[in-house]
Amino acid sequence: ATGEEAYTLTMLTLNTLVRLGVAHEATRGNITLPADWKLEVLGTDISRQAIRIAREATYIERREGLSSFRQFPPAYLRFFDLVNCDDNDRKTWQIKESVRRHMRFDLHNLMNPLPPQRDFDVNFCRNALIYMDQEPQKIIVRALHQALQHGGCLVLSLVDTMAVPNLYHENRQNKCVLYEKR
């Protein structure tokens, strides 16, 4: 993907930390975490072009809203800087450095049995497994399991199925399924 999901997750996390009083918002969209906190979000894709777009962090506003940031709360525009407005009133926005500093985007094939990194607290893999047969699903779910620290969670969508259920403890909450690493 081109970064929208990973950036939205980071914005949501930063916004929540401010609301909880853990982080401080000095100016609009510029959030500072406590010195002993680390927030790092890794977005991966198999496409070099998708990774390039994600790293640029620049998105065009269309009639239906800001690029493919769907159902995006207007208050979250504070995490963007307006970088261009053309003659057709099309706006180009770039995600602020205060969000981008928590991001990393790397090439990675989900079918690689080795994870790109280890000791994650949470892995999100939503709406990807539904396009694969059971054996590729098992490879991916095992790699995601290896990438999690003990007690970490894997988040799938409701349409994804767990190919290796004995690796996780399942926890269903509303429209979300969390799998805690055993």
Regions found by a protein language model. Give the residues of each.
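Helix-to-beta-strand junctions that scaffold the AdoMet/dcAdoMet cofactor pocket
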Residues: 17, 132-133, 148-149
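A short glycine-rich, Lys/Arg-flanked "PGG" loop and its adjoining helix->strand segment in the class I
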Residues: 138-150
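Conserved class I S-adenosyl-L-methionine
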Residues: 1-3, 42
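Short, well-ordered alpha-helices that flank and scaffold nucleotide-derived cofactor binding pockets
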Residues: 11-18, 56, 146
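Core SAM-dependent methyltransferase catalytic element
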Residues: 164-182
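Conserved beta-strand signature within the Rossmann-like core of class I S-adenosyl-L-methionine
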Residues: 150-158
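Extended basic-aromatic, gly/pro-enriched interface segments that bind polyanionic ligands
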Residues: 18-120, 124, 128, 136, ...
